[in-house]
Amino acid sequence: MKTPLTEAVAAADSQGRFLSSTEIQTAFGRFRQASASLAAAKALTEKASSLASGAANAVYSKFPYTTSQNGPNFASTQTGKDKCVRDIGYYLRMVTYCLVVGGTGPLDDYLIGGIAEINRTFDLSPSWYVEALKYIKANHGLSGDPAVEANSYIDYAINALS
């Protein structure tokens, strides 16, 4: 999985050199941010269930047809609702992974790369997940640096889906 730090080390190693002062400064910057990122990951993990459920309800409110249209990819049944919450939780989990590693690698590697194909195959609308992520961003309860860190990855996911 790529992160800014692993990419810097890989580049230096492939060129047979030590890390440059700029690369080392980047590493120090990341370590200074790490505390805020880990606090955000911890808080989001602790609230994951309520955030995913609330986000699903936000989707149902904005897109009411999702709860009235029949089919395995809609939330007209409890099974469909459970799948929706599960899928939103997956996005949230990827955000927490990004916070832990300090880069967009988890979103890039595990989600964004194949999202268009997944959405097309299962007739899922990216706008549902955009709405869910907006809800999470507005309701995660974080402030200060942890909020800045979390919001940057949430925004990254929103932009990738838009």
Swiss-Prot record:
InterPro entries tied to this protein: Globin-like_sf (IPR009050), Phycobilisome_asu/bsu (IPR012128), Phycobilisome_asu/bsu_sf (IPR038719), Phycocyanin_a (IPR006246)
CDD domains reported for this sequence: PC-PEC_alpha
GO biological process, one term: photosynthesis
GO-annotated cellular components: phycobilisome; plasma membrane-derived thylakoid membrane
Positions annotated to bind (2R,3E)-phycocyanobilin: 84
SUPFAM superfamilies attached to this UniProt entry: Globin-like
Location of the protein in the cell: Cellular thylakoid membrane
UniProt membrane topology term: Peripheral membrane protein
Function field: Light-harvesting photosynthetic bile pigment-protein from the phycobiliprotein complex (phycobilisome, PBS). Phycocyanin is the major phycobiliprotein in the PBS rod.
Xref: PANTHER family: C-PHYCOCYANIN ALPHA SUBUNIT, PHYCOBILISOME 32.1 KDA LINKER POLYPEPTIDE, PHYCOCYANIN-ASSOCIATED, ROD 2-RELATED
Assembly information from the UniProt record: Heterodimer of an alpha and a beta subunit, which further assembles into trimers and the trimers into hexamers.
Protein name: C-phycocyanin-1 alpha subunit
